[in-house]
Design a protein with these regions (language model features):
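An active-site-proximal "capping" alpha-helix that borders the catalytic cofactor pocket
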Residues: 44, 89-105
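Acidic/histidine metal-binding catalytic segments
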Residues: 57-64, 106-120, 133
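Divalent metal-dependent phosphate-bond-processing catalytic cores, especially two-metal-ion Mg2+/Mn2+ enzymes
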Residues: 2-14, 18, 32-42, 46-58, ...
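A generic alpha-helix surface/boundary motif
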Residues: 21, 45-46, 96-98, 114
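His-Asp-centered metal-binding catalytic motifs of divalent-metal-dependent phosphohydrolases/nucleases
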Residues: 62-84, 95, 117-125, 141
């Protein structure tokens, strides 16, 4: 019991990080020579981690989320090799087995593998989303795809309204694609100063020059 507690308090965190890093490198090798797909999962992983941390995910859920984000598109390669296509449904059908093989080889626990399989097998399914890991993975994938697919703002807005649930994900969308919502006018400083001067004059306040 004491040994188990020591593992939980100390080396467990280090072991988790090392395993995620090994999975990261394994996925880069898996897609060697294909920078497009490597950079896609790198961005999805980074945004998933950011949203997960900002939303306060616990350590175990974050672990699953990071692993799933790294391998979420692993089925693309299998689909292309088998059928010459890599649409969302093909990814969901072929991805889980490929993810299981890689995660098993790297020593991931069975419960983690099962959840990652589920997420990989549903990451293009946007109804009945169960769990923050699932929700965040979908949001991160959308954020990256919005840019990579060159979607117009109207399509982005509609899908965000239907799919996005986390406050962090929504904020990133707004800052990334709708900055005009937050930009102040070019003369905001002058306008604010004029308002202050008008107020001072109305109140009859004397300010020494």
């Amino acid at each position: 019991m004491q040994k188990k507690q020591q593992l939980r308090d100390g080396s467990r965190e280090e072991d988790i990080m090392n395993r995620i890093d090994r999975l990261y490198m394994e996925m880069i090798h898996y897609y060697q020579g294909d920078p497009k797909h490597i950079q896609h999962f790198v961005k999805v992983h980074d945004l998933s981690r950011l949203i997960g941390q900002s939303e306060g995910l616990d350590e175990d859920t974050m672990y699953v989320l990071e692993a799933a984000a790294l391998v979420h598109d692993i089925g693309i390669k299998v689909g292309m090799e088998k059928y010459g296509r890599s649409d969302g449904k093909t990814q969901e059908a072929e991805g889980p087995a490929a993810a299981r093989e890689m995660l098993t080889a790297l020593g991931f626990q069975e419960r983690v593998i099962r959840r990652v399989e589920y997420l990989v097998g549903h990451h293009h399914t946007y109804k009945d989303i169960d769990g923050l890991d699932y929700q965040i993975l979908v949001e991160a994938d959308f954020l990256v795809n919005y840019f990579e697919d060159g979607l117009d703002k109207e399509h982005i807005k509609k899908s965000v309204e239907k799919i996005f649930k986390t406050e962090t994900g929504k904020k990133i969308v707004k800052d990334m694609f709708f900055p005009e919502t937050f930009q102040k006018s070019e003369t905001w400083a002058q306008d604010a100063l004029q308002d202050l001067e008008d107020f001072i004059e109305e109140q009859g306040i004397y300010i020494r020059q």
